[in-house]
């Protein structure tokens, strides 16, 4: 989605990353850039593999803590839905049956923090439609554009403290 943002950004994500791996990569991958803000979208791979929502929330809290410790403002982003059938086809990997409840739990936590609700455009969707993410997890250009529209609208409000 970063190519559709109205402000400069650096994409530090890694495909397949778990929330635990994001915590471990923080010092090496985030700190060298000395960002003022960190947009954090993580937990999808963990939750679809059956990692408990409480563990993902703990990882997100740890990333927030590390950000604040280094003078970075953490901004969490809610998790859009996935499409387990398409994930199975693309990666030959099963998805944890309770993924929806886990996503709901993590998103409820995120919505109580400084956040941008990037899942909002997809809330009425039970699963992510193929036309938005062929592989069921990584948004295609149209999904990325939809997420960027939300970020572009909400980011100025978040940094202004609204």
Language-model features: locations:
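Catalytic His-Asp segment of secreted/periplasmic serine-dependent ester chemistry enzymes
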Residues: 81-162
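Charged helix-capping and loop-helix junction motifs
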Residues: 53-62, 99, 103
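Serine-esterase "nucleophile elbow" of acetyl-processing enzymes
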Residues: 1-15, 20-37
């Amino acid at each position: 989605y970063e190519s559709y943002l109205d402000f400069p950004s650096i994409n530090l994500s890694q495909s397949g990353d778990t929330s635990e791996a994001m915590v471990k990569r923080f010092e090496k991958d985030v700190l060298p850039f000395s960002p003022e803000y960190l947009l954090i979208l993580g937990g999808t791979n963990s939750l679809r593999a059956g990692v408990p929502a409480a563990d993902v929330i703990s990882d997100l809290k740890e990333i927030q803590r590390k950000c604040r410790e280094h003078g970075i403002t953490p901004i969490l982003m809610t998790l859009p839905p996935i499409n387990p059938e398409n994930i199975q086809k693309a990666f030959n990997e099963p998805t944890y049956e309770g993924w929806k409840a886990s996503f709901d739990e993590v998103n409820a936590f995120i919505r109580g923090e400084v956040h941008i609700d990037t899942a909002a455009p997809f809330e009425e969707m039970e699963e992510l439609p193929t036309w938005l993410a062929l592989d069921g997890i990584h948004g295609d250009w149209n999904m990325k554009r939809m997420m960027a529209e939300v970020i572009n609208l909400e980011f100025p409000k978040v940094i202004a403290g609204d």
